[in-house]
């Protein structure tokens, strides 16, 4: 299972890390996703959900 939000689709983004000399190195910013149990089609399922979706009430924990 990918570390991607089941509700909003948020996932890791990529970009460059820049040193003081402005050298660039590829890096990734991970999304704040938590593994939680939610109801999917009336059955509990353990999925990754972003913290933003949890805080906004888009999903109900079981």
From Swiss-Prot:
The keyword Ribonucleoprotein applies. InterPro entries: Bacterial_rp_bL28, Ribosomal_bL28, Ribosomal_bL28/bL31-like_sf, Ribosomal_bL28_bact-type, Ribosomal_bL28_sf. The keyword Ribonucleoprotein applies. Pfam families: Ribosomal_L28. GO terms for cellular component: ribonucleoprotein complex; ribosome. HAMAP family: Ribosomal_bL28. This is Large ribosomal subunit protein bL28. It comes from Halalkalibacterium halodurans (strain ATCC BAA-125 / DSM 18197 / FERM 7344 / JCM 9153 / C-125). The lineage of its organism: Bacteria, Bacillati, Bacillota, Bacilli, Bacillales. The gene is rpmB.
């Amino acid at each position: 299972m990918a570390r991607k939000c089941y509700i909003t689709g948020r996932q890791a983004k990529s970009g460059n890390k820049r040193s003081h000399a402005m050298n660039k190195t590829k890096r990734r910013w991970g999304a704040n996703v938590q593994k939680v149990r939610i109801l999917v089609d009336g059955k509990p399922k353990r999925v990754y959900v972003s913290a933003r979706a949890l805080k906004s009430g888009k999903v109900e924990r079981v």
